[in-house]
Amino acid sequence: IDPHGTARALMQADLQQDLRVDSGKPLVFHQLIQVADNRWYWYQRYHHLLVDGFSFPAITRQIANIYCAWLRGEPTPASPFTPFADVVEEYQQYRESEAWQRDAAFWAEQRRQLPPPASLSPAPLPGRSASADILRLKLEFTDGEFRQLATQLSGVQRTDLALALTALWLGRLCNRMDYAAGFIFMRRLGSAALTATGPVLNVLPLGIHIAAQETLPQLATRLAAQLKKMRRHQRYDAEQIVRDSGRAAGEEPLFGPVLNIKVFDYQLDIPGVQTQTHTLATGPVNDLELALFPDEHGDLSI
């Protein structure tokens, strides 16, 4: 009997169920699976209506904090999380603010300059709906190749380099030098959402232009500058960008593939316990999501 294989099969079987909101299945599910005397899998599954990628490690750390406090015989730590109602109230205030108007103007201009969306699928993008029926493939650089490349290009941030490589790769797959992709923003910094667990992420259109004469560091630096500018306006909903142009959301997709850089802190501080986080699934996908995982050792997986 392979206890690790059995545990992974249990988790995959759970993920492959009909887990839509109206399925009757629990929206939150935790399971401890013992595979050896001193080794366990702590399986966690949440519906995306409840959490996003930022929330997972935050909730896990709080559970670990409670566990450690109980081990020491201490009272249960107070919750560090902001009620989600505060996030909703803050967003409603934003909708009535000058910042909303500035963001609307910024995205209207971005929309005018945006190249057509790319897709690897022959099916048309309009009319598609996000699905949880997802084909997942994990790609990893071997033997520290990404770490070596990042060392050679020391003037470029690792996350910027990872994004530039992925943008080039996607352009090559689509045979496109100019295309629009989605980029996931957390929409939390400077907001009540920074200490809330509900889902607030926003997927916004990123125009990618690949210049034949440009070097990889130059592309990485330019994309980073684009994202920095977009980040100032990340609270504005992508659906609203489409509505502002007189179309219905979903009628005219702004992008196909979505790029997602995941740099969350997955480390848990539990005395006497070594932990490692494995991401088994993400939220629903409309076309293609490329999730980039730079790790603490300087390597990269997609």
Where are these predicted regions, by residue range?
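Extended, hydrophobic beta-loop-alpha segments that form or line the acyl/peptidyl-thioester binding
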Residues: 54-63, 177-184, 200, 211-219, ...
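Acyl-thioester-dependent condensation/acyltransferase catalytic cores
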Residues: 1-44, 109, 116, 131-144, ...
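Active-site-proximal acidic secondary-structure segment that organizes catalysis
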Residues: 33-85
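Short amphipathic alpha-helices and their capping loops
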Residues: 1-9, 13, 24-26, 61, ...
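His-Asp-centered acyl/peptidyl-transfer active-site segments
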Residues: 38-39, 92-104, 132, 151-166, ...
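C-terminal lobe/hinge of AMP-binding adenylation domains
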Residues: 45-47, 264, 295-297
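A short N-terminal helical cap/helix-turn-helix that marks the beginning
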Residues: 63-82, 110, 117, 230-242, ...
